[in-house]
Amino acid sequence: MIKLLFMGTPQFSATVLKGLLDNPAYEILGVVTQPDRAVGRKKDIKVTPVKQLALEHGISIYQPEKLSGSQELIEIMGLGADGIITAAFGQFLPTILLDSVSFAINVHASLLPKYRGGAPIHYAIMNGDKEAGVTIMEMIKEMDAGDMVAKASTPILETDNVGTLFEKLAIIGRDLLLDSLPAYLSGELKPIPQDHSQATFSPNISPEQEKLDWTMFNQEVFNHIRGMNPWPVAHTFLEGQRLKIYEAQLAEGEGLPGQVIVKTKKSLVIATGQGALSLIVVQPAGKPKMSIIDFLNGIGRKLEVGDIIGR
């Protein structure tokens, strides 16, 4: 039985971890995940999906704010793991830790060398890519630059957003890891170096990127909304208040960027740099997420054709 240390945080990671837990060839000695966070207006404490799964299986849990130089680092190095598996962990691994095990493998949600970094799925959708994928790669000190063990891809549909694509890629990543790991560990599967000259990067989404630019073409704004749903969520401004936009549809029409060009009891169409978008699901400041119909019956009832949002 191969003894593993698992490191990850979101549901993507938990899906991969569950695959390893269900496989009798592997024993998970411990998991390392991000610390619990206070979320929402009530500041409720939320544990990570990886921690929740580890609790259910009685696995030792380590949650350092920063792994390097921590007491937790000393403890996990003493577990005697054969190898490390990471998936969307969110921290760099110290070289001393990588050197302490026989192998260290990362499950990365992009077709490397494209989209190294923390937000590959967001950028794949925002950039209008036709496919996304997962790469199983060896871990080295440089971010997502290790040799590639295996790859798998899937189409990005017009109906996909970050949430749906995360779910698809988590399953693909789980299966790809379980399929390729035995051959990799036996030496039958030889890793392939990345072409570093082709590397692109997907840094974590900044607050500035969440704001919609209505001067962009409608397809670009549409992709941007999908690439922010369900987190961190794209927004615009209405009378100085933030209006989050979760869903929209491509529409026809002309007008100034951000201008209301159609308003009925059931629809609100906003002009972009070319074409337009029909808003479907929004969230006004201080309110719950709602359909555009509910919005137009409430806060949005004051909007008129010709008004401009986003200022």
From Swiss-Prot:
Keywords: Protein biosynthesis, Transferase
Enzyme Commission number: 2.1.2.9
Binding positions ((6S)-5,6,7,8-tetrahydrofolate): S110, L111, L112, P113
MF-aspect GO terms: methionyl-tRNA formyltransferase activity
Enzyme class: transferase
Pfam families: Formyl_trans_C, Formyl_trans_N
InterPro entries: Fmt, Formyl_trans_C, Formyl_trans_C_sf, Formyl_transf_N, Formyl_transf_N_sf, Formyl_transferase-like_C_sf, GART_AS, Met-tRNA-FMT_C
Keyword NADP among UniProt keywords: no
Alphabetical list of PROSITE patterns matching this protein: GART
GO cellular component terms attached to this protein's record: cytosol
Catalytic activity: L-methionyl-tRNA(fMet) + (6R)-10-formyltetrahydrofolate = N-formyl-L-methionyl-tRNA(fMet) + (6S)-5,6,7,8-tetrahydrofolate + H(+)
Homology family: Belongs to the Fmt family.
Function: Attaches a formyl group to the free amino group of methionyl-tRNA(fMet). The formyl group appears to play a dual role in the initiator identity of N-formylmethionyl-tRNA by promoting its recognition by IF2 and preventing the misappropriation of this tRNA by the elongation apparatus.
Record-given protein name: Methionyl-tRNA formyltransferase
Encoding gene (name): fmt
